[in-house]
């Protein structure tokens, strides 16, 4: 099969030079990213006018930019497929779905950031610009179909993430988190480059499509080695065991709004990359990479949820929880069926709201108390019923308790796994889900202790809520929105699953993989 970009140029050979350039670039495919880029530039320009001006104008600029990106993504849904930038980017439904998850995660992360930034003395303009840069890299990564565009997008996301992790310069934990993230991330980038060089040497091209065709006829040990290198990079981005060591320290030391974005936006980009490169390139090694992913999924679900039991920090507990959640999502990838891929997309959308809702509650609590310890939440319902209710619902959803949105997300994943005879993954998933429910409910039980004397000292001295302070209203909007979707979304899970199914059905890359699985099943 010829390369997409070359095929497009061949069919348009008689076009005028200007028209040919427009057709080969097809810049309309990246208009959502263009909106984010313009918002980032405008944010930097406004920041030059001073902190007071930035505090007033940066939030609406970010809202307009991200809102425009989401509208443009909606317009791209089911649009005719045309490769852009000579086949280096493809805005199929899969890319649109994951880019929408990332843009929404950034929007919600910004809503819960303003009060935190004001309280900690963080420059709003710089922070928002770096977060938008990370968003830009993550969104481009979802549609990248070329090794060069993948690496550029990956590094844009990574470098911005390093800066965000260490943005609290006066906090030693933040600097430590940034350094650890930088060192491990740089190693992962080097490993990916080495794997990419092997793929280029085997195929003579950087196009994923051409590489996939070349590997069909060249299942050499070098190709298998490149698979290991690429898989290691993907596992690092999604924080899968044993490439998870950076996650607890980075989550604990980084600013909480940054952790909220990394837990969803960066993870969504990682899974989009996994689908694009593993399914698109390594079809000839389908059994091998699925076996490796099965091992990673079992390890991630087990270690993530078991180690979370012993945590005393709320952010560190959610860090290990996110490792376990990555293992659940990997079940859909291992299945390789339409239901599996759709359940994977659905669960990422559900994880967006329930995880960011939990982080909104944690930020609201830490702003008032300065504490991150789980024990300090004891008796919180007496002083702050809103946080108690919101955090309880989000944690129950993360644990998979019906009728929350997270329950239906897990059920779809487990059904897809069982239908594809992935019994080990489903059984491990069910057992570790029960383990996760234990530590989630332990937090809830602590918050709703009945006797006033059992409340923590932090809660006893809990300050009154002042919603008139700068950044509090956006935080409340994000909190209520996330909790509302998490609680009510379970009832609306069928339309959400239809949306996820449509994302898979209209993506040729996934349909080819599904057909391959079907042929092997018949064989």
Swiss-Prot record:
Entry annotated with the keyword RNA-binding: no
Enzyme Commission number(s) of this protein: 7.1.1.-
Cell compartment(s), UniProt: Cellular thylakoid membrane
Any one GO biological process: photosynthesis, light reaction
Topological relation to the membrane, as annotated: Multi-pass membrane protein
Record-level Gene Ontology MF annotations: NADH dehydrogenase (ubiquinone) activity; quinone binding
Enzyme class: translocase
Reaction equation(s) it catalyzes: a plastoquinone + NADH + (n+1) H(+)(in) = a plastoquinol + NAD(+) + n H(+)(out); a plastoquinone + NADPH + (n+1) H(+)(in) = a plastoquinol + NADP(+) + n H(+)(out)
Cellular component GO terms, alphabetical: plasma membrane-derived thylakoid membrane
UniProt keywords, alphabetically: Membrane, NAD, NADP, Plastoquinone, Quinone, Thylakoid, Translocase, Transmembrane, Transmembrane helix, Transport
Pfam family, one: Proton_antipo_M
Main localisation: membrane
Claim: Transmembrane is one of the keywords in the record: yes
Function: NDH-1 shuttles electrons from an unknown electron donor, via FMN and iron-sulfur (Fe-S) centers, to quinones in the respiratory and/or the photosynthetic chain. The immediate electron acceptor for the enzyme in this species is believed to be plastoquinone. Couples the redox reaction to proton translocation, and thus conserves the redox energy in a proton gradient. Cyanobacterial NDH-1 also plays a role in inorganic carbon-concentration.
Record family assignment: Belongs to the complex I subunit 2 family.
Subunit structure: NDH-1 can be composed of about 15 different subunits; different subcomplexes with different compositions have been identified which probably have different functions.
Protein name: NAD(P)H-quinone oxidoreductase subunit 2
